[in-house]
């Protein structure tokens, strides 16, 4: 078959798109890997429609194919003739902060539902799409191209975190986010109980006419869109919630790689966690550097973003398949895919601290190394891009057949 895959200027998205392209070619398919950023709308549509392909693959919501047209109310994917595969590595609308925009895009996705396929990390996204009449929606997990084996030697680093965070939920300006005071409470609930599901509370919130009125005139026109608008707002609290959790670690050194969203340019107590046991290191420059830190850390912390209730994010797969040890907030999907999920998960800040103390103690090395090896063995054959592509192709084949019969 013939595919177009769109590249991305965002490193994590481009890494995923590149891995999909490489793996499809290994399967023997023809892949056009394109940078669409230089096209205007007309040239983009005409160029893509002029190429004979079976599927256009979009791996993130910022791809050009998912832009709204400059000339009318349609989205560019509506103007393409090819079938489209959307791979949603984030919550469906987490990048957008306009109810009307989300509603329009959801309708546009409904318009092409007979020739499109959605693969979602988050289970609630599948429910959302089906509620909108989009039936070709399937669960998918992340994959990783890392293949480093665990090392059974003393770690270079102790407790580490790679990624962005802020210092505190208390310092974050909740009033700057529509519905922000409600959303901040949800962030605190997730801080207190990592398996707390935000989606039911979001759904309840949009039943309140007073809340809807406070969100503006578009809020009561499409409740599905309003829910996603609130989830996008809630996700802004992810970085401060991570810092809030890490601030509870008092008895172990924590090294944060990156972390500061301003990269040191802004002096603001919200941006940097001021704590004697917390040390900031330069941001990693590439994913091989990250892989090395994952492998050489005693404990890699993972704290999922608030846009997800159940999904396992890519950091967990990357840590394990870099030969590292991960300690993560409790994720329902992790219990579905990992036999040892309970051993590497925490529900509360107190449990996180207890497990940091336990796995940091060299007296527990046998248990620590056994877990690291066993989880790596479980993941290495299951969460590859070969398996991800195989899953996608097997899912779209019967859906294609069913659509031909309609």
Where are these regions (language model features)?
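Short N-terminal targeting/anchoring amphipathic segment
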Residues: 48-65
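Catalytic binding pocket for nucleotide-activated donors in carbohydrate/polymer assembly enzymes
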Residues: 3-9, 15-27, 32-39, 111-112, ...
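Structural motif
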Residues: 54-57, 83, 117, 299, ...
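Active-site proximal beta-strand in glycosyltransferases
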Residues: 77-92, 119-120, 158-160
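Membrane-proximal helix-turn-helix segments that form the acceptor-binding/catalytic region
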Residues: 100-117
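Histidine-centered beta-alpha loop that forms part of the nucleotide-sugar donor binding/catalytic region
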Residues: 60-61, 88-92, 121-123, 141-144, ...
């Amino acid at each position: 078959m013939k595919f177009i895959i769109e590249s991305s200027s965002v490193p994590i998205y481009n890494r995923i798109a590149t891995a999909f392209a490489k793996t499809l070619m290994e399967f023997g398919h023809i892949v056009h890997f394109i940078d669409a950023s230089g096209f205007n709308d007309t040239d983009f549509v005409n160029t893509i429609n002029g190429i004979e392909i079976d599927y256009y693959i979009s791996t993130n919501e910022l791809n050009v194919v998912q832009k709204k047209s400059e000339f009318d109310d349609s989205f560019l994917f509506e103007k393409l003739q090819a079938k489209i595969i959307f791979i949603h590595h984030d919550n469906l609308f987490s990048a957008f902060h306009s109810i009307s925009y989300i509603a329009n895009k959801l309708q546009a996705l409904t318009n092409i539902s007979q020739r499109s396929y959605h693969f979602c990390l988050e289970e609630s996204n599948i429910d959302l799409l089906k509620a909108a009449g989009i039936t070709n929606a399937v669960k998918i997990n992340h994959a990783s191209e890392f293949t480093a084996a665990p090392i059974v030697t003393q770690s270079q680093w102790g407790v580490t975190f790679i990624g962005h965070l802020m210092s505190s939920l208390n310092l974050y300006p909740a009033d700057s986010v529509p519905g922000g005071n409600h959303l901040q409470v949800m962030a605190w609930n997730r801080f207190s109980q990592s398996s707390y599901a935000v989606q039911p509370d979001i759904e309840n919130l949009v039943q309140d006419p007073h809340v809807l009125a406070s969100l503006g005139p578009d809020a009561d026109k499409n409740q599905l869109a309003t829910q996603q608008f609130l989830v996008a707002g809630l996700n802004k609290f992810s970085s401060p919630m991570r810092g809030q959790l890490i601030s509870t670690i008092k008895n172990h050194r924590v090294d944060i790689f990156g972390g500061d969203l301003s990269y040191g340019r802004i002096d603001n107590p919200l941006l940097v966690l001021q704590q004697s046991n917390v040390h900031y290191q330069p941001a990693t420059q590439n994913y091989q550097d990250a892989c090395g830190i994952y492998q050489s850390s005693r404990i890699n912390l993972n704290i999922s973003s608030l846009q997800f209730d159940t999904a396992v994010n890519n950091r967990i797969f990357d840590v394990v398949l870099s030969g590292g040890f991960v300690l993560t907030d409790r994720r329902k999907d992790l219990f579905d895919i990992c036999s040892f999920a309970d051993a590497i998960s925490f529900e509360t800040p107190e449990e996180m601290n207890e497990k940091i103390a336990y796995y940091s103690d060299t007296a527990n090395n046998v248990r620590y190394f056994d877990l690291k090896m066993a989880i790596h063995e479980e993941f290495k054959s299951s969460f590859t891009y070969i398996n991800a592509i195989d899953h996608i192709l097997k899912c779209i084949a019967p859906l294609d057949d069913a659509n031909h019969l309609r």
